[in-house]
């Protein structure tokens, strides 16, 4: 979604303005009938309409800021990091996070450069459609929406197990049903309810993570019952996990590759911040990109560092049965340090995180499918909306994938979680890879037309090398992350590892013939990959430097801290 600013109106209270004005931008009419645009900014809210006059989104500025933060703190951080630690040890877990951080940096940089030059709706899917091929763009859109829908099933699959930290009197199926109905119903309300819920949940998550980092630092320094921990669990081979201890580097390399999938799932959603900043001024966008990296380093890398310091990789609680919360390294660190009350409080935070993540996945997936229907590559019934502007058919379609959560009732919860995580993470990898490919093509078109990147509103760092690096690494990981299934072939493991790639290729081929038929047009290379001279980098271009921006400096230390975080 693109946020814009209209002068001289303001959004919210004076306090809101001083904190959030960096996300307000100028109004630009749509470049075509399918674009979503800002119709008016008034009454302390941002109201977004599409060309049908049916879909309506009302989000206050404070909602948008906190949703941006909340997207960086999800279930992957609190749950899947334990699996990563047990597989690879603390050092390689940290290296995995730093490795994926470099990919996220490249992806957000690429999106920033493209989205500021051509601030169109539809995010990166439009860029793929313009500069790679129409069929590739449509396939990416479907895969991206599908990954959000799959993630909804993943969230439902673990919510009951997390609650079982307190009691197992109520069966898993009952908890899944309760939250299945609740989260689906919430997304059928006007979007202002979604914004309000996400605002408060993101506030809780932000406070909890910052508090846990402070707590972990104190425990490492000796505040816990075990005294100073320091690097105790990095000595005597503990730093490298079982692979290095048994001198089996092949096993260790496999564990590291598999661990990358966990890291990728944890990081997914960070690209949404760059998309939201698509029509920011150059100064505002640079700030937004810096904040993405700051959030990653604080909320992910720093948390992973302290997890590795406080929890040994071979702690039996990381892999024992009894529910995902009991496997969470955050809670294990608290229990090992002798803090009796905090695990219960933090478990409530994890429940809040799952509810927030499930709510967001249905919202994001439904809007993606709605946009695909507008573009003519999804059933038109997805355009059906309520009087309040909610695309209820797209919401119900996305939410239907929540039924996958019931798989935990008849299967091991960890196995089901890893199935869905792998499918969603691989789909996310494909999206990241084609964002980088789109940027490479974009830079090639600029060079062919003699347009210097120095004239762009925002120039990404380390390009084009960073984009090539991200594309090569992402596609390589996506291809090799399941190669172990060929040593001892298992149909279930093969399906889990590669179904996203298979589905993407099938959709790509299907849409190619949908657009070009089965005649000679279908076999022209120019329809497989758009020639540089035919790539459209003109539609939707706007000189953002001509717009005046009034971003007041923060007035106190709290506002300075808030602007860094939010």
From Swiss-Prot:
Subcellular location: Cell membrane
One term under GO cellular component: plasma membrane
Topology of this chain in the membrane: Multi-pass membrane protein
BP GO annotations: amino acid transmembrane transport
Pfam families the record matches: AA_permease (PF00324)
Glycosylation sites: 490
Protein name: Probable lysine/arginine permease CAN3
Organism of provenance: Candida albicans (strain SC5314 / ATCC MYA-2876) (Yeast)
């Amino acid at each position: 979604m693109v946020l814009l600013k209209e002068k001289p109106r303001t959004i919210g209270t004076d306090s809101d303005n001083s904190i959030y004005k960096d996300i307000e931008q100028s109004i630009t009419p749509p470049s075509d009938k399918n674009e979503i645009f800002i119709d008016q900014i008034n009454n302390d809210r941002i109201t977004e309409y599409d060309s049908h006059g049916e879909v309506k989104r009302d989000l206050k500025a404070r909602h948008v800021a906190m949703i941006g933060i909340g997207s960086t703190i999800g279930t992957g951080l609190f749950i899947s990091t334990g699996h990563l630690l047990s597989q690879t040890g603390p050092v390689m877990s940290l290296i995995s996070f730093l490795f994926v951080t470099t990919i996220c940096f490249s992806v957000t940089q690429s999106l920033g450069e493209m989205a500021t030059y051509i601030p169109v709706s539809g995010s990166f899917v439009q860029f793929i459609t313009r500069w790679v091929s129409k069929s590739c763009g449509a396939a990416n859109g479907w895969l991206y929406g599908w990954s959000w829908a799959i993630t909804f099933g993943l969230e439902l699959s673990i919510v009951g197990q997390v609650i079982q930290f307190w009691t197992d009197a109520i069966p898993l199926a009952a908890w899944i049903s309760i939250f299945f109905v609740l989260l689906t119903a919430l997304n059928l309300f006007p979007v202002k309810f979604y914004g309000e819920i996400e605002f408060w949940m993101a506030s809780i998550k932000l406070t909890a993570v910052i508090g846990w980092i402070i707590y972990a630092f104190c425990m490492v320094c000796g505040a816990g019952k075990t005294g100073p921990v320091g690097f105790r669990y990095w000595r005597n081979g503990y730093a490298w996990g079982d692979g290095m201890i048994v001198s089996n580097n092949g096993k260790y390399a496999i564990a590291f590759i598999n661990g990358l999938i966990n890291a990728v799932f944890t990081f997914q959603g960070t690209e949404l911040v760059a998309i939201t900043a698509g029509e920011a001024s150059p100064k505002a966008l640079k700030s937004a990109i810096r904040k993405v990296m700051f959030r990653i380093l604080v909320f992910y890398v720093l948390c992973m560092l302290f997890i590795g310091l406080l929890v040994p990789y071979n702690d039996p609680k990381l892999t024992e049965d009894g529910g995902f919360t009991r496997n969470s390294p955050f809670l294990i660190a608290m229990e090992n340090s002798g803090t009796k009350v905090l695990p219960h409080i933090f478990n409530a935070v994890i429940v809040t995180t799952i509810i927030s993540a499930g709510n967001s996945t249905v919202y994001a997936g439904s809007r993606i499918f709605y946009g695909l229907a507008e573009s003519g590559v999804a059933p038109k019934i997805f355009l059906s909306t309520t009087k309040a502007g909610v695309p209820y058919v797209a919401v119900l379609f996305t939410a239907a994938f929540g039924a996958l959560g019931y798989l935990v009732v008849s299967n091991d919860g960890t196995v089901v979680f890893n199935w869905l995580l792998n499918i969603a993470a691989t789909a996310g990898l494909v999206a990241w890879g084609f964002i980088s490919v789109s940027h490479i093509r974009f830079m090639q078109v600029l060079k062919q037309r003699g347009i210097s990147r120095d004239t762009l509103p925002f120039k990404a760092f380390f390009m084009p090398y960073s984009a090539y690096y991200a594309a090569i690494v992402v596609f390589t990981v996506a291809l090799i992350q399941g190669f172990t299934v060929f040593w001892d072939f298992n149909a279930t493991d093969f399906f889990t590892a590669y179904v996203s790639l298979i589905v993407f290729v099938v959709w790509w081929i299907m849409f190619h013939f949908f657009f070009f038929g089965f005649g000679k047009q279908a076999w022209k290379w120019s329809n497989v990959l758009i020639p540089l001279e035919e790539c459209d980098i003109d539609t939707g271009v706007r000189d953002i430097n001509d717009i005046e921006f009034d971003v007041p400096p923060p007035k106190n230390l709290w506002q300075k801290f808030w602007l860094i975080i939010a």
